[in-house]
């Protein structure tokens, strides 16, 4: 059953047991990258909470965090990695199956 496979996949990747982290990865799957400010607005978390979630995703290899110089100074940008991309692809395939 696909539901069992999906639950197992999420349990095996405990970092995704928190809905906001799964949501961040799903968003990055479609956008490929996002500025920290964009993620703040989308998640409605405070800066500290969001940064902690991103650190966990980064430590797990699902996202890459880069500080990029801009006219306004260095800004944090988050990119989905190949590992994150593959995981979300598996999640979406399981959701599509009937």
Regions found by a protein language model. Give the residues of each.
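N-terminal helix-turn-helix DNA-binding core of bacterial DNA-binding proteins
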Residues: 7-49, 77
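Basic amphipathic alpha-helical segments that dock to polyanions
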Residues: 54-60
């Amino acid at each position: 059953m696909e539901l069992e496979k999906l639950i197992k996949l999420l349990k095996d990747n405990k970092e995704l047991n928190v809905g906001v982290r799964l949501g961040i990865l799903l968003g990055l799957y479609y956008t490929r990258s996002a500025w920290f400010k964009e993620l703040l607005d989308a998640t409605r978390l405070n800066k500290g909470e969001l940064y902690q979630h991103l650190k966990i995703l980064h430590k797990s290899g699902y996202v890459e965090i880069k500080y990029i110089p801009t006219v306004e100074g260095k800004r944090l940008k988050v990119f989905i990695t190949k590992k994150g991309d593959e995981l979300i692809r598996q999640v979406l395939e399981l959701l599509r199956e009937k």
